[in-house]
Amino acid sequence: MVEAKNGSLCGAGAPDPGRAEPPHAADHTRQITQRQVRGAGGMKSVGQDSLGVQRTLSVDGKEYGYFSLAAAAEKLGDIARLPVSLKVLLENILRYEDGSSTTVKDAEAIVAWLETASSTQEVPFRPARILMQDFTGVPGVVDLAAMRDGIVRLGGEPDRVNPLVPVDLVIDHSVMVDVSGTKDSLERNVEIEFERNGERYTFLRWGQSAFDNFRVVPPGTGICHQVNLEYLGQCVWTADTGGKTWAYPDTLFGTDSHTTMVNGVGILGWGVGGIEAEAAMLGQPIAMLIPDVIGFRLTGTLPEGATATDLVLTVTQMLRKRGVVGKFVEFFGPALDNLPVADRATIGNMAPEYGATCGFFPVDRVAMEFLRLTGRDEHRIKLVEAYAKAQGLWRETSTPDPVFTDMLELDLSTVVPSLAGPKRPQDRVALSDAAAAFKTELTKSLGVPANDVGTRAAVAGRNFEIGHGDVVIAAITSCTNTSNPNVLVAAGLVARKARAKGLTAKPWVKTSLAPGSQVVTEYLNASGLSADLDALGFQTVGYGCTTCIGNSGPLDEEIADAIEDNKLVAVSVLSGNRNFEGRISPNVRANYLASPPLVVAYALLGTMTQDITTEPLGTGSDGKPVYLRDVWPTNAEIAEVISKCLSREQFLKRYGEVFKGPKQWQALQVETGTGTYRWNDGSTYVKNPPYFDGITMEPKPIGDITGARILAVLADNITTDHISPAGSIKKSSPAGAYLLERQVSAADFNSYGARRGNHEIMMRGTFANIRIKNEMVPGVEGGMTRLVPGNAQMPIYDAAMHYQQQGIPLVVFAGKEYGMGSSRDWAAKGTMLLGVRAVVVESFERIHRSNLVGMGVLPLTFKDGATRQSLGITGDEVIDILGIADLRAGMDLSLVIHRADGKTDTVPVKCRVDTADEVNYYKHGGILHYVLRGMAKAA
């Protein structure tokens, strides 16, 4: 029985969302240390409920308190047609309303959004929890440890620095495809992973024991977003406080941009920079502009042969064209009645690629089926449904359409098999056009002279040649697709049919399978498809991000040499979500996103230059050509395998050991009982960053930037990969030189991502992407610049250190969509540590702009159509930025350009410090300084 009734909260207390375990995780409580459980929760002495909206919900005889949106509507006005995502924000405000940091006016601003379907108001938001991965998590824990040192300097106690909301860190970013195509690939890659990362992992285990509310999902378990979707996420969370159990929406910030994957099951969350996440976990409300909400109406059903991957690439192309940066996208329409959560999660996952803050699907019957399949507790499922219905968050076919800022519509029956590439995820191309489009790109954007397109090169010691367009990496990878049984089973069936016909992968293709969850192995084994994938070289290489984030591992040396010696444009085909240039492999210049079954098909074909829809994949054992149509499974074949081989029990089994980890994890020894971390000066992985050196209780006054030199002039679409690469470290780079000086061999360099706990390496890696092009040094790729005056060409890091020694501040100029891609806080941290005081561009991607402010770097945008080109910026100028002393959110500042010929121009620029809170962060030198001083004063 489910019923809602009025109720009230006795006393002045308010909900305190403690560390609520996922409902099917009771058996793991013993694995969580007492320290992690003690002091859990984030809402302290707030929630005064000025509007009187507390109510009680009864589910199977158990009562839950909640903050009723229906009751709020009686005081604030009708909210029935608010987008569901904004209703979640409204509930958050009601629950935290304390009359100061969060007020009734904030709630009124959400309701007022309905008047124009837009707003210029900012409101505070506090997520229920934080999700981290290890590349961002290690520097996050480093920062927390450094803050403990900092608060001691200010006279406080180290235990004042603790996460106040639950934090889950999933180790998924470090495994690399060192070994592939063998039966023991998984075991050998795990061994190598621990050899490389034992120091980092020991540090994380220290953090797990030292900090409250901090859990670690060990390596070899899965990808954070898939673990979040299948296990950590609850849709509705509960907490026991003040003698009552409270229910509230599951919301989160993630330190990875693809946190939005969990939007597919009705959980509102998005990626933020590690800096912002650290502030949120330390109890700070995060101010956000009430977003525009774009409604995306879905109708029809996917046709035979089209996959969820094809759907999301189509959605990404449409939304990029429309322009949704900084906006919520909310999906609705009749197609949702039969659109599985796996497909929804694929669409939600790629919100960063289409530019939105999130890609949200409301809770409905389909979501409940997913919760049941994945092993959530039956009472929790009933609670989710009852709560969603009581709050108007539940979607039915008959639910009236919400009010949206703007709308798009897609008939799923029009979706066709597709790829996206060769450099951007929004560059979708129909599969039938892919070969022709690639040949055009070869000469257009990839720089191959027309008379060299047919070049073939011998591979030493092998009996084959390779040429432009040959596929050298075929990777089934990424939570985007490995969370989706439909496309993984399809890949297995393609492998089965190809194997039966005697086809094999081309010998120059490095093949791999890296599921985002161990459940994938369960159903592939149960169906017998693992054997078919293994036969084509798609053995499981690890449970982690691997190729999707650039951890593709080395190609065979002879193949890599043939590519580099002959300047070949080699290709990767991967079931990932990003394909930026230089991301996947240093030997690969063209990267195509594809569904898992197409990844298998391209491994068979071996090239992008042939039309895979009309030309044979190869010759079968009977001597006849085998075409894509011969091996492609029907929807009915896929559905039959899933119905027989995917079960709730598989999720319960695998997630029953989610905190266990491999034997190497269990063997790690850590020092416990220390309030501050004992830094090892000789460590090349974990170092105490200088952020809080010399910190005082009061910040110094801010002022104008004068006499600045230009460190780099960059083009459009500069990604956080360009600014702070995650991939391999070159011996010849400043970071490589640093490691060699410390007796680290090149074989043990690991990646920039794995070294993010060491600021010395990350500073040297800033702007060090092998494909970045600084317009100050035309024709040169890599992190180079000119030292001005004098024009000496040198690595960006070396130039920055020269300027720092002279006390000269630095500025970076760039074009549109600066900072697109991953929510990589080191792209801002490294920028700051190089001495860059301001970044002047045409437009920013959302997360990176926020991160720059969080590190005390001024983000500025040109006005009135001005660009670096129209202003003639060459890098020889001296720059002043005036008006900073009177900084206000969104104000104009003056950019003064002193040219080499003695002329001076002054132009207005918009200060993208967007909120009053951000102004405070900037005045303090960054968000962590602001939080630390607040903690010290409160002690």
Region spans (language model):
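Intrinsic disorder/low-complexity segments
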Residues: T29-T33
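Cationic, low-complexity basic patches in intrinsically disordered or flexible, solvent-exposed regions
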Residues: P22, R35
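Intrinsic-disorder-associated, low-complexity terminal segments enriched in Asp/Asn/His/Tyr and depleted
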Residues: D16, D27-H28
